[in-house]
Structure formats: C-alpha cells, structure tokens
Amino acid sequence: MEEEKILESDLRHISFVMPKYTPIEKIGEGSFSVVYKALDAESGRYVALKAITRTSSPARVLDEMMFLKTLGGRKNCMGLLGCFRNEDQVVAVFPYFEPIDFREFISNANLADIKRYLHNLLIAIEHVHSNGIMHRDLKPGNFLYNKESGRGMLIDFGLAQYEEYSEGQHAEGGAKPAGPLLFFNSVVSKTKPPGYYERDGRPPMKAPRAGTRGFRAPEVLFRCQRQTGAIDMWSVGVIFLTILTTQYPFFYSSDDIDSIVEIATIFGHAEMRKAAKFYGRVWRSNIDSIPEERIPFETIVESLNPWAEVGSDGYDLLYRMLDLCSSSRITASDALSHPFFDDLKTHENCA
C-alpha cells in the first residue's frame, strides 16, 4: 500500500528503535518533531514515538526531557517511558493516549463536557506552574482529551521554560523602556486613508515569543521581557472562547501585527490603551474595525453560537482568563476553585 511505503520512507531515520518498537502510523507532525503510534514488542502495548528533528537545538531537547522528568506522569502531564539517541537523532517514548479530535469535541460538547475538559487542563497547568515552569505553547493540539474517559494529557514541553521573575516584579507590568514605544501597528498614518496601519520604524524590543499564533498573550505580543505563567492562562482563555463559540481557530492572524489587531477589535481602544500603559507601551490606531469600548464576550458567544450553555459563572471565568493585564489574570490554582466547577467537583466527590 502507498501508505506503508510512505511510512517506511519516513521511518528510516529512526530505524534504530524498531527492534523494540514497531511503528504503525504517523499521528502527528510539528515544526520540531514527528509522532508515530507504535507497538511495544515486549509489553504488547501501544506507545507514541516522538522523533525529534535533527535541526532541533541540543539544549532544547535536553530541556524538554528535563521538564518531562520533573512533571510527567502526574496531574495530567504526559509521562516519559524512555529516550533513545543515535548520533544526532533523538526518539522519546510516551504512553499512547487516544484523544478525540478537537473539532469533533467542540461541535457537540455540552456544558458538562466543557467543564471536564477545562478542569483537566487546569489541573495540568497548575501542576506545571507550581513547579515554577511555563509551558509557553498551550493550544488544543498540545492537550489530548478523551471524551469517553473524561481524562486529558498535556504534551509537548519543547518550548517550556522556568519563570525568571518574582511575583512582585511581574505585578509591575512589562518591560520598562526609557521612553514610550509605539508597538507595531500603533503608528497612525497621516498620509494613508483611515484604517491603514504601518510598522514602527524603530528596532523592535527583544523578548521571548514562544507559542502558536492566535494563542499568544498580550504581553508576548507587546514584546515584554517579564513573562510568567500568566501567558499560559491567556491561552487557556482562548481555548475556552474557542469551545464556546465553536470557532476553531478563533483568531486567524498570520503574524503578531494582525494578532494584536484581532485582540483590539474585541477589547477596544480604551482597554488597549490601559494594557499598553501597563506594559510600558503606547497604543494608537485609526483602524475602523476597532471600537472605542470592548465588545462583551456574551455578545460574541451568543452571535457565533446561539445555543451555547455558559451561565454567569462561565462568563466570569472567561473574563478573568482573558484579562489583558497579566498581573490580574486568574491563576490556574484560583481557576480550579472557581464556582464554574462547583457542580463538577460535587459530582466527583459523590462518585
């Protein structure tokens, strides 16, 4: 079969693990790795083989293995069964976890399903953050969820980092330049028609830019050097909004410029000015699609998914996750204690 020929060609570079593991099919592929479902010849169980690309930084690979050793196998974080190396090729072995397709999940998830999904994800994030680590690439593809069992697994710690700043520093806001810096599209063009935006000609601030477009927090887009686990909670909020609206992806931006504009079309100029000031930036724009005041999440959800079951507690949690200012954004620990999950916890206690 053609599929087998392609599979054999793909697997030549990891043939050194094939005496022990028999690859069955490719189940995932990213910028830095390819993942295969395989059979463990010794145990007879399925496993996932993650073949890390040769172009990956050795330090990055080592860091990922370190984070997996620290976090894996507990609190909904994927465990590491083993790791093999042959010259510059690394293959990590994980338990195989059968997830539901995210698009299928959001197409028919009820409120109880949504609560279980988010609760599982938050348990993993709280575990990560309690160890002083930021995941930095939260998105549906990195959280495997099995609807039948009601269990989820956080995967891919390739971009994870330890937090470098204390809570006190974090609360002060973002990077503090000597003078106000206009961010990307915030320069108002005097020679172009309304709605036009252009780049600030000055050199951009250098700061960590991990994550996937559409899930990056405002402080990442504003190029702030002080970043904490709050960036993960923004990503959880985007996932929550995506589920409620059934729009995946919710943000379609192709780059950071478009990303901040998309956020601004929801939050409005007034909120963007406050956030920019918090991060030591200046926000100005004459783009017609950006309102002065924010559009309520209730309006967005009801217009895109009139049948959505959310409730006041659900919206409150959504607002606290998608808070433009990182210091007041809800933490994973506090989110787990939010009233939105009260009936879920009561049900679990009675089970």
Curated annotation (Swiss-Prot):
It catalyses: L-seryl-[protein] + ATP = O-phospho-L-seryl-[protein] + ADP + H(+); L-threonyl-[protein] + ATP = O-phospho-L-threonyl-[protein] + ADP + H(+). ATP binds at residues 27-35, 50. Gene3D superfamilies: Phosphorylase Kinase, domain 1, Transferase(Phosphotransferase) domain 1. GO terms for biological process: cell division; meiotic cell cycle; regulation of cell cycle. One of its GO terms (cellular component) is cytosol. It is an enzyme of class 2 (transferase). SMART domains: S_TKc (SM00220). GO terms for molecular function: ATP binding; metal ion binding; protein serine kinase activity; protein serine/threonine kinase activity. Its cofactor is Mg(2+). Its EC number is 2.7.11.1. The active site is at 137 (proton acceptor). Keywords: ATP-binding, Cell cycle, Cell division, Kinase, Magnesium, Meiosis, Metal-binding, Mitosis, Nucleotide-binding, Serine/threonine-protein kinase, Transferase. Residues 21-341 form the Protein kinase domain. Serine/threonine-protein kinase. Needed for the initiation of DNA synthesis during mitosis as well as for synaptonemal complex formation and commitment to recombination during meiosis. Belongs to the protein kinase superfamily. Ser/Thr protein kinase family. CDC7 subfamily. This is Probable cell division control protein 7 homolog 2.
